[in-house]
């Protein structure tokens, strides 16, 4: 399965697509200047278990860091992903 993950800054989200169809989304907002609040990660039920949520999160986190933003993870999935990343490093 070929999963394409795209940052869409104009919509404040990262999307995952398979064959051109959106199968997952991570939403964020710049709640205060310099901080991205990542508040929602959604993957279509039929696509769960394929690592899509992790790819969405990795892309959003990398983009935030590249832009020098702090991350405020109010979404439980993003919070768990970041905790695992810290444990691995």
Labelled PLM ranges:
Residues 12-23:
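Conserved beta-hairpin
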Residues 41-48:
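A short, internal acetyl-CoA/4′-phosphopantetheine-binding micro-motif in the GNAT/acyltransferase core
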